[in-house]
Amino acid sequence: MNDFKLKNKWDIPSQSLPIIFIGAGGIIRNAHIPAYKKLSLNIAGVYDLNHETAKTLAKDFNISDVYNNLDDALNNKDVVFDIAVPADQLLPIVQKLPLNSYALLQKPMGSNIQEAEKILKVCRERNITAALNFQLRFSPMMLCLRDAIDKNLLGKIVDIEFHYSYYLPWHLWPFLEEIDRVEIPYNSIHLFDLIRSLFGMPEGVFAYSNTHPKYPNLSDTKTTAILKYRKDLRCALSLNHCYQFGDKNQNANLKVEGTDGVAFITLGSTV
């Protein structure tokens, strides 16, 4: 087992397009921009409903263009629109995207299944090449896991288990208090997407999300779920995002067990 190498990088395209941000919040500042800078991608412009927020982001990261309105921001060709807005704002923006354009859409894909279907329909009608921001499946550790599975290093997969017990600072996103369903669509959807990308669509999903007294205005912050696959494959998720007792015993782990081996993955910083 010391001789094998696992793929841990996604192939970088030979050509890249400038990026324009629609939305200038914490996800863009703390996640997208550092990743783009690491890849030396060109961040060309930014628009946000709060113009001062957009100006501050542009100043902090040397972004050349700050747009006064959405129409000006979308009046660009041969760019990628990185759209990071709350779910209920996604469909109206997608409807305004130029024909034959490219977009990265922040999850979830609308507020409900009806909006998701409309977004898909608009993308097909306007020939928009779009992706949802499900980045976990592309992370180095998950690329290694995928490669190990593809090379049959673990044998037949018989057990998949996510276990999360950590504190998530929900207060950083006050708009979530207005949302009917929070934990899965806005948070753990990444885990469900990863499982689906590795093992295909399950036959069924049994899930229940719970509240926590620390966040009485949030619809839910914890989830227990079972994904139904074949009879000899168990898949379970136990997700507590409101652990209250310090860093020492927090954890965020994935176990994928096969007949010939097992992979244990710790999912980095739990903040």
Where are the regions a protein language model picked out?
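N-terminal Rossmann-like dinucleotide-binding module
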Residues: M1-F61
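Contiguous beta-strand/loop segments that form the cofactor/metal-binding neighborhood of enzyme cores
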Residues: M1-K5, Y186, F192-T270
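Short active-site oxyanion
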Residues: P18, L41-G45, K77-F81, V182-E183
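Beta-loop-alpha module in the N-terminal Rossmann-like domain of NAD(P)-dependent dehydrogenases
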Residues: F61, D65-V122
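Rossmann-fold dehydrogenase core element
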Residues: K118-L136, G155-F162
